[in-house]
Amino acid sequence: MAQAGRTGYDNREIVMKYIHYKLSQRGYEWDVGDVDAAPLGAAPTPGIFSFQPESNPTPAVHRDMAARTSPLRPIVATTGPTLSPVPPVVHLTLRRAGDDFSRRYRRDFAEMSSQLHLTPFTARGRFATVVEELFRDGVNWGRIVAFFEFGGVMCVESVNREMSPLVDNIALWMTEYLNRHLHTWIQDNGGWDAFVELYGPTMQPLFDFSWLSLKALLSLALVGACITLGAYLGHK
């Protein structure tokens, strides 16, 4: 696999293809417009997304599902450091890790979806609260996988509740957080290539992600978000 060098891979591409995959699992098509990525450390420009749920959506976990929808155009940064194209194995390994995480806590993620109470006005607060709690005690690959899976849950829930435009914002928030808060850690720990080497198909299963701690963090963050919402509504 080609080495990305110090600048690393394009986080926006990684986010967009992951969300595309998670929506494809639920039978939604994701058409991505001509969107340029923002440089590292800057807020990216929102994309142009459209969602068309199939008449009879059938969940699927096949890795090639995303390829059946409209292809993603290459994402090239207009300014800032030149980013390397993301190798397919990075996307596949991240999907595998996310699927493993969601299988282990399928019931908890279902409960999380019902507790999010997403609206156009609460979505950013929900995202910020959970992500802040998730990385409060530091960063590791397990928490990064949980970050992607949580973003996927938010996107699916947004489409389920007929709030598809929220996915634009969620993709932007995820990319911005990766660029500003996680990119340095990822590069200092070998980049996404190291993630593939550690958790690729031929390596050990993803059993060292501190699943219970992640579950507790996500639950605590959701409780905090609900308390905050209750306090806000109490003053309305």
Swiss-Prot record:
Provenance organism: Canis lupus familiaris (Dog)
Subcellular location(s) per record: Mitochondrion outer membrane; Nucleus membrane; Endoplasmic reticulum membrane; Cytoplasm
Membrane topology, as annotated: Single-pass membrane protein
Pfam family, one: Bcl-2
GO CC terms, sorted: endoplasmic reticulum membrane; mitochondrial outer membrane; nuclear membrane
A GO molecular function held by the record: channel activity
Stated name of the protein: Apoptosis regulator Bcl-2
Modified residues (Phosphoserine): S70, S84
Alphabetized SUPFAM superfamilies for the sequence: Bcl-2 inhibitors of programmed cell death
Biological process, per Gene Ontology: autophagy; extrinsic apoptotic signaling pathway in absence of ligand; intrinsic apoptotic signaling pathway in response to DNA damage; negative regulation of apoptotic process; negative regulation of autophagy; positive regulation of apoptotic process; release of cytochrome c from mitochondria
Protein's UniProt keywords contain Ribosomal protein: no
Chain ranges for the short sequence motif BH4 as given in the UniProt record: 10-30
